[in-house]
């Protein structure tokens, strides 16, 4: 009786969390992240968020106090992330994703230990919509096609086509220190 009651309560708590909107589905994460990331970078960021928070907007690391979907450290508020003024702002999914973009642009993927440890290698649980459409394609294509690369000084932009859509997915600029900074349009 107690085990059944305990399972029922656990199930009810899980349902309440979903109704409250604290845990996003893959589709909800895609919709949010598409406003900030594109193509393979979007897929990688979906993976990072999954491993960092399991898409739980209210996730807080008890040791580091990293918070939200991308487990952003509170010290980044106001520093790398101008839209975050207090650590509690990191529990706002939009602010957390904006901060993730700023951190990605300044530190790269390796800012997240889950990426550095290889957890996102061959990730396929929740991918960029264009990547999933492309993967389901039976037209024999093996990946995105490069349609041009332009270099101006230390700045290179590349246009890709994946499936039926095309566009500028990423723009890399060398910051002079040997690291590429990624910008998304």
From Swiss-Prot:
Q: Which InterPro entries match?
A: Glyco_hydro_22 (IPR001916), Lysozyme-like_dom_sf (IPR023346)
Keywords, alphabetical = Disulfide bond, Signal
> Which cysteines share a disulfide bond?
47-126, 77-84, 81-99
Molecular function per GO: lysozyme activity
Q: Which residues form the active site?
A: 52
Q: Which Pfam families match?
A: Lys
Q: Where is the signal peptide?
A: 1-21
> Matching SUPFAM superfamilies, A to Z?
Lysozyme-like
Which stretches of sequence are listed as region Disordered?
Answer: 137-158
PANTHER family per UniProt: LYSOZYME C
Family the UniProt entry places it in: Belongs to the glycosyl hydrolase 22 family.
Protein name, as recorded: Lysozyme C-like protein DDB_G0291137
Q: Which organism is it from?
A: Dictyostelium discoideum
Name of the gene this protein is made from: lyC2
């Amino acid at each position: 009786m107690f085990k059944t009651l305990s399972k029922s309560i656990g199930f009810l708590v899980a349902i309440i969390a979903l109704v409250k909107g604290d845990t996003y589905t893959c589709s909800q994460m895609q919709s949010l992240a598409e406003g900030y990331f594109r193509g393979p970078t979007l897929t990688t960021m979906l993976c990072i968020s999954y491993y960092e928070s399991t898409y739980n907007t209210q996730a807080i690391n008890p040791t580091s106090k990293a918070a939200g979907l991308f487990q952003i450290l509170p010290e980044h508020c106001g520093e790398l992330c101008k839209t975050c003024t207090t650590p509690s702002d990191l529990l706002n999914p939009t602010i957390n994703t904006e901060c993730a973009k700023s951190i990605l642009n300044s530190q790269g993927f390796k800012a997240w230990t889950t990426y550095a440890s290889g957890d996102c290698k061959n990730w396929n649980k929740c991918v960029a919509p264009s990547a999933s459409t492309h993967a389901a394609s039976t037209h024999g294509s093996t990946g995105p096609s490069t349609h041009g690369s332009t270099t101006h000084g230390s700045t290179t932009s590349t246009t890709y086509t994946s499936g039926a859509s095309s566009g500028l997915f990423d723009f890399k600029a060398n910051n002079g220190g040997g690291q590429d900074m990624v910008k998304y349009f």
